[in-house]
Amino acid sequence: MSIANIDALTRVIDHREIFHDEMLALMRRIMSGEMSPVMIAAFAIGLRVKKETIGEIAAAAQVMREFATPVAVPDKTNLVDLCGTGGDGVHTFNISTASMFVAAAAGARVAKHGGRSVSSSSGSADVLEALGAHINLTPEQVAISLERCGIGFMFAPNHHASMKHAAPVRKELGVRTIFNILGPLTNPALAPNQVMGVFHPDLVGIQVRVLQRLGSSHVLIVHGMNGMDEISLSGETMIGELKAGQISEYVVHPADFGLPVYDTRVLKVANKEESVTCIQRALANEDGPVRDIVLLNAGAALYAADVVTSITDGVRAAREAVASGQALAKLSQYVAVTQSFKTAV
């Protein structure tokens, strides 16, 4: 079933839901350049005001996956993505990027999907380049990197070329729309397991149900009660978990994992150079909040990847990976593997 653009706009203005097949058709028009920038903007804002439903988000994500340039990873065992929606306004160092090296060192296979900074001090791509990695890889090279060192970083612009039609609109609007929450739902390697941070507590229940519809296996959607799109060390974190088809929602606290409470301000950075320093300190096992928040989020990734059976066990495994030097070695290995593609050209 198709729906005219103006009919769809009228429906969202009237606070009525766009049906699944209609949303598929509308999103395909956006991704193929068949919808004007004015209509894209109006539709995105209309959805925002109405509040996007689980069905609408799932349909839009399905189309983004359909148009994405994929990374072929036939074996999905222990394959996990660590990412966030961004936009939390907290400006911490790149916690999920640091956690990626720890999780990989402890046995997870990490297919991380990310880009350059939009709202933070630095994006995962910016920081990985500053650490010495080569990020502009082909899908085949990403798959080889994943096979060789347990990490495959997918630079978002290389995999979502069709977003070029919506990107200028999104940038000019300057407010959150459905496009802000679609990126983390569209991993090009189709990682079945995921730790996703979200900028608003309402998104915890929404995103976990979207990923349930999209067929994910083991997912943790997290929102720190201080506003962080990570599992927080400053207090409670809301978690929506999808496991074996079932959803549970609960709250965790650093003390649950034997970790102290810290003020979030000690994790803030102003630029990518400061973020790189924090990552290096964490991987070098420097005691303190920078290391501890990486242990916590890497532990969650190990749990989502089904390497361990609880976040507590994940934190323990992450601690061992850092203390033994394996996490720091994983960073060096990843940089060497990605640079080998650059020199091979």
Swiss-Prot record:
Q: Which residues bind anthranilate 1?
A: G84
* One MF term in the entry's GO annotations: anthranilate phosphoribosyltransferase activity
Report keywords, A-Z.
Answer: Amino-acid biosynthesis, Aromatic amino acid biosynthesis, Glycosyltransferase, Magnesium, Metal-binding, Transferase, Tryptophan biosynthesis
* Pfam families registered for this protein in UniProt: Glycos_trans_3N, Glycos_transf_3
Which cofactors, if any, are listed as required? Mg(2+)
Annotated anthranilate 2 binding sites: R170
Q: In which pathway does it act?
A: Amino-acid biosynthesis; L-tryptophan biosynthesis; L-tryptophan from chorismate: step 2/5
Q: Which residues bind 5-phospho-alpha-D-ribose 1-diphosphate?
A: 84, 87-88, 92, 94-97, 112-120, 124
**Enzyme category, top tier:** transferase
Amino acids binding Mg(2+) 1 = S96, E230
**EC numbers, comma separated:** 2.4.2.18
Q: Does the keyword Transferase apply?
A: yes
Q: How is the cofactor bound?
A: Binds 2 magnesium ions per monomer.
Q: Does the keyword Signal apply?
A: no
Q: Give the family from UniProt.
A: Belongs to the anthranilate phosphoribosyltransferase family.
Task: Share what the entry says about its subunit structure, partners included.
Answer: Homodimer.
Protein's name in the database: Anthranilate phosphoribosyltransferase
The source organism is: Leptothrix cholodnii (strain ATCC 51168 / LMG 8142 / SP-6) (Leptothrix discophora (strain SP-6))
Lineage of the source organism?
Answer: Bacteria, Pseudomonadati, Pseudomonadota, Betaproteobacteria, Burkholderiales
